[in-house]
Amino acid sequence: MPRPRTTTVRDLRKSNRSSALWQVFLNGPLTRQEVGAVAGLSPATVSNLVADLVADGVVAEVGLEDSNGGRPRGLLQVNPGYGYVIGVDVGETTVLVELFDFSLQLRARHTSVTDVSVLDPQDAVAHITEGIQAVIAEADVPEQAILGVGVAVPGLVEHREYAVVHGQSIGWLGVPLEEMLRASTGLPIMVDNGAKSLGQAERWFGAARGTDNAVIVLLGVGVGTCIISNGEVYRGATSSAGEWGHTTIMAGGRTCRCGARGCLEAYVGAGAIAARYEELSPGGAAGSPADLEGRIAAIIASRDSDPAAAQVLGEVVTYLGAGIADLVNLFNPERVVVGGWLGIALSAELLPGIREAAGAHALQLPFSCVEIVTAELGQNAVALGGATLPIATVLSAGAVLTGHGPARRVPGQPGRWTAQAAR
């Protein structure tokens, strides 16, 4: 039987440093006293930790709090220039790459629009690599200052030694995306599902902030969720929890891109909405066929004058409400956040109807305790969520890394990085 691991003074110091840094990052600017109170650390411990974090360039003094006559206390926040992170949103026809400083302020953006209906893995790697190079050049930061790259993808992400993507709807079956990107960029890469990335961004900064039990919905071409349970992202046995778009809403119904019939995505996904409109109004003038977002916007805008648009959106509201009711009944969240470009577009005009439809299908008690709200971070929130992946890694390690910001790459080993032991 293996012996239990002994907690050392070094482990405790790293844990305390991480706790303090998390609080400053998410809730700063804070005083030292506030850091100690929320992190559960003594004044002496906080004083020593903050001195180290300031000396290491991770945290900065940013002025004094307003005083009511007592001695004003210094305010702390993370140092934006400590390092930089990159977030990537891999869509099915677009790749968005954004570079952020350590406080997650946007510094550069690059968008690639592909000319194929579904992005091949090799093409995706090429677009991501091109985008990374472009944003580093635009922001004029040294590559050595990049703490990491977080990549959000459609499909299931299996976290083995390296992340492997299973995107059944887009033909990505067992794609070793993390290894491919490490080889092409030489940077530390983290990969996660797009809905989970969106959920993390909304929980840190957006409409799910302050919740311990929430469901963040991503509606676009694909449909998925991020489930927050007791303050943690619920992943399941193989990190595939949350594939709400492939729950059955109509037995034997429309064929979904995954190959099954009756999936929710086949009724409320963007492609399904456009196809249903075309079925009811062949050759209708609801936007350009090549511009799916434009087509959806046109359908929403014409709902009062176009009977086909009104019928399509009425069906979407009903199915979406029923699907949200399932989430309410299954997970008992305090909040459901509707996000993704399609979710934002629909809820801007139709959220009251969606709430009403959800209430018609949900159990009374859990529905009486839930808020259904629109996401707050906009259409690029998935890339921001990708950027939170390397940030979370740094914060959880207490920013115990070598050099200025990032760990240093091991010579001759692309993508491998050294880490400095805790002080």
Where do the PLM segments sit?
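ATP-binding/phosphotransfer module of carbohydrate and carboxylate kinases, centering on a glycine-rich
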Residues: 1-64, 68-73, 77-113, 117-144, ...
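Short glycine-aspartate micro-motif
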Residues: 75, 85-89, 146-150, 214-218, ...
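Short, acidic, Ser/Thr-enriched surface-loop or helix-capping motifs
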Residues: 101, 159, 228
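Hydrophobic "anchor" residues
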Residues: 106, 163-164, 233-234
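Glycine-rich phosphate-binding loop and adjoining helix at the ATP-binding site
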Residues: 109, 113-213, 349-360
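Short secondary-structure boundary segments
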Residues: 153, 219-221, 270, 340-341
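Active-site glycine-centered loops adjacent to acidic/histidine catalytic or metal-binding residues
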Residues: 194, 220, 386
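Glycine-rich phosphate-binding loop of actin/hexokinase-like ATP-binding domains
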Residues: 211-268
